[in-house]
Amino acid sequence: MAPGRSGYRLRFRSGARISGDSEQTQGFVQEPGSCAEDPGGIVLKRVIVIDNYDSFVYNIVQYIGEVEPDCEIEVFRNDEITIEEIERKNPTHIVISPGPGRPEEAGISVDVVRHFSGKVPILGVCLGHQVIGYAFGGKIVHAKRILHGKTSKIVHNGKGVFSGVKNPLVATRYHSLVVEEASLPEVLEITAKSDDGEIMGLQHKEHPTFGVQFHPESVLTEEGKRIIKNFLNIQDIQVKKVSEETEIDIVSALKKLVEFEDLTFEESRQVMNFIMSGNATDAQIAGFLVALRMKEETGDELGGMASVMREKSIHIKAPSPRTVDTCGTGGDGFGTFNISTTTAFVVAAAGIPVAKHGNRSVSSKVGSADVLEAGGYKLEKTPEEMERELKETGFSFLFAPLLHPAMKHVMPARRQLKIRTAFNLLGPITNPARVKYQVVGVFDLSFASKLATALQRLGTERSAVVNGGFTDELTTCGKNNLLLVTQEEIVPMVLDPEELGLKSGDPEELKGPSDPKEAYRMMESVLKGEASRTQVETVALNAGVVFWLVGECDTIKDGVGKALDLIRTGEAYKKLREVMDYQKTLGNS
């Protein structure tokens, strides 16, 4: 872990050195204010380090201070700063540290690369290097060898951060994962390789964004300080301000769309960021959404838009990597009872946290928010209350209007359009808890592969995009289509309820009441096992797929059996009561 507390500021003096591990570390003083320039009027470098909870952060900070004595360094853990807060600090350089796990587990790191690449010079070290590869669409795979504190010879191209560096150089490696060369994005180029053929250096072809898989800050790495110095010597690129040039991007995007040309993931991100920052006019937003629909949205376009929505949302910290969501697109018009919401309580009863993202009615007569509210659930919570509830009960409803404040910029255009737009598809894949396991119901099978691609681009671990034929839920009323989505592949499947030991159901029994209180009573009856077989087994089928996705059960059939047991034993209904009783412990809003 990095020295001192998260979010500390270091102002280096000429010739400073760091030693010790307290907040009063020798060689620097902590200052509360900005450090835009020194008393002599020289503009100072501002370096923000994203700390991925790794002890090497200390060494990186020390090296930065030694090679650039007149600089300001601020260190923030990867879950304790937002994109907007970084922008306000106007850094001249950003460093993404090493750390445990994979890029998609590294908090804000991936979003930092996607947002600031091309605006601010970025250096990623080890995990940070993998973050860069992943952020632009590369795959992170197991290395040929697991190395911990071992040295290798690194051959490099002598450019960028390797300018003037000994070639080959001996470098220290601590990693079990690498960026896969076969899936390397077109925008990235390899700048260094190890003697065993692994990628050791990357650089964006157009941006000052660099990654090194090895540790330049290790004492056993040759010329590590020169690599750091080369990075810091890159001419500062200030964060782009809203300008006419930015507006041209949305106009250019519109021109492409009306010619039925697809946008890339990054292009859709740029347009979405412009829109969600409040810089687009209602006419531009409406034109973009209509043109996108007329051309037909792609998975990359939806993924790019969703990634910005996630960045702009209020982040909810999940209590477990296995936290799931059961949110669908709605829009099927069939008017089913609240299947996905009921499913959530069965899943939570098994000890798997459910961060249920949702809103009021879309296609059902009563939306998930409506039915929960009818049972006494408090929708208006602070983010801290949601996190606490999720941790203590295993369930929390993430009421979308509270957690997506940037949506205010698009609502006027959406209200005036009154047609289906890309935003009708984005809800399920923009969960503020950044869940990695989901069952995403889709009202139209033609959108399934697009949402699957978007989920893959967003870093899902193991999710399913499903369609029940006449509804955006899995049902026992016929065969269901399912796309299994992992980081490596998208696999189509057909689920036949009868092959899972379930009886063919009657679609009419899935229709729900129009009164929220009656809808809540129906949910209670299903969770008690007192509802019709079609209703109970449909919920069990959806929960069973979740159990299979998160690895709770080896097969979907086993998952269905587990779900039925949780209903029959009363555990599912008990979880509902626990969550509703928990609401009484919360203050009135």
Swiss-Prot record:
Catalytic residues as annotated in Swiss-Prot or TrEMBL: 126, 215, 217
Catalytically driven reaction(s): chorismate + L-glutamine = anthranilate + pyruvate + L-glutamate + H(+); N-(5-phospho-beta-D-ribosyl)anthranilate + diphosphate = 5-phospho-alpha-D-ribose 1-diphosphate + anthranilate
Enzyme Commission identifier(s): 4.1.3.27, 2.4.2.18
Report the leader peptide range. Answer: none
**Domain of life of the native organism:** Bacteria
Q: Which GO terms describe its molecular function?
A: anthranilate phosphoribosyltransferase activity; anthranilate synthase activity; magnesium ion binding
Residue ranges of the region described as Anthranilate phosphoribosyltransferase: 253-589
Cite a single Pfam family from the UniProt record.
Answer: Glycos_transf_3
Job description of the protein:
Part of a heterotetrameric complex that catalyzes the two-step biosynthesis of anthranilate, an intermediate in the biosynthesis of L-tryptophan. In the first step, the glutamine-binding beta subunit (TrpG) of anthranilate synthase (AS) provides the glutamine amidotransferase activity which generates ammonia as a substrate that, along with chorismate, is used in the second step, catalyzed by the large alpha subunit of AS (TrpE) to produce anthranilate. In the absence of TrpG, TrpE can synthesize anthranilate directly from chorismate and high concentrations of ammonia.
Q: How does it assemble?
A: Heterotetramer consisting of two non-identical subunits: a beta subunit (TrpG) and a large alpha subunit (TrpE).
Q: Known HAMAP family for this protein? A: TrpD
Family to which this protein belongs: In the C-terminal section; belongs to the anthranilate phosphoribosyltransferase family.
Protein name as catalogued: Bifunctional protein TrpGD
Species assigned in the record:
Thermotoga maritima (strain ATCC 43589 / DSM 3109 / JCM 10099 / NBRC 100826 / MSB8)
